[in-house]
């Protein structure tokens, strides 16, 4: 399956890696057959993120970081750092978190 990358994501994530230690975290273990596909996708679009900075886990509550950008509120409720809700059609009704609508907003918030 060829899932497109979000507009400006590659550029902004690359800039973030120049200032922060960035980890890509995916709850992909819920769907174990997707692990290899997700890793190949990551290597295709984000080759500058090494395997040491990719985390596949069952639940993101174990992640200890300063920021978590996620489109699922369930992952943000238990996060102890600053949660940022990335806008997606399934979360438009949620108002519990600071929201970023696109990667340019992430850039402005975390890099300006």
Where are these regions (language model features)?
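Substrate-recognition element of Asp-dependent hydrolases with the DxDx(T/V) motif
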Residues: 3-5, 9-38, 42
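A structural micro-motif
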Residues: 20, 49-52, 81-82, 97
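A structural signal for isolated positions on well-ordered beta-strands in alpha/beta enzyme cores
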Residues: 21-23, 67, 84
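Short catalytic/ligand-binding loop motif for oxyanion handling, primarily in non-cytosolic enzymes
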Residues: 22-24, 31-35, 62-64, 75-78, ...
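Short, aromatic/basic amphipathic alpha-helical patches
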Residues: 36-46, 80, 95-97
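Structural recognition of alpha->loop->beta junctions
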Residues: 41-54, 100, 104-111
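Conserved Lys-Pro-Asp/Glu-containing loop-to-beta segment of HAD-superfamily phosphomonoesterases
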Residues: 51-80
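Acidic, Mg2+-coordinating phosphoryl-transfer loop and its flanking beta/alpha structural elements
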Residues: 69-104
């Amino acid at each position: 399956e060829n899932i497109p990358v979000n507009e400006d994501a590659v550029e902004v994530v690359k800039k973030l890696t120049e200032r922060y230690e960035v980890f890509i975290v995916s709850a992909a273990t819920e769907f174990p057959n997707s692990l290899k596909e997700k890793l190949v996708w990551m290597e295709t679009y984000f080759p500058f993120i090494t395997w040491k900075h990719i985390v596949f886990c069952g639940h993101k509550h174990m992640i200890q970081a300063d920021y978590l950008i996620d489109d699922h509120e369930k992952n943000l409720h238990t996060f102890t750092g600053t949660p940022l809700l990335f806008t997606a059609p399934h979360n438009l009704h949620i108002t519990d978190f600071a929201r970023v609508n696109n990667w340019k907003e992430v850039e402005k918030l975390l890099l300006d």
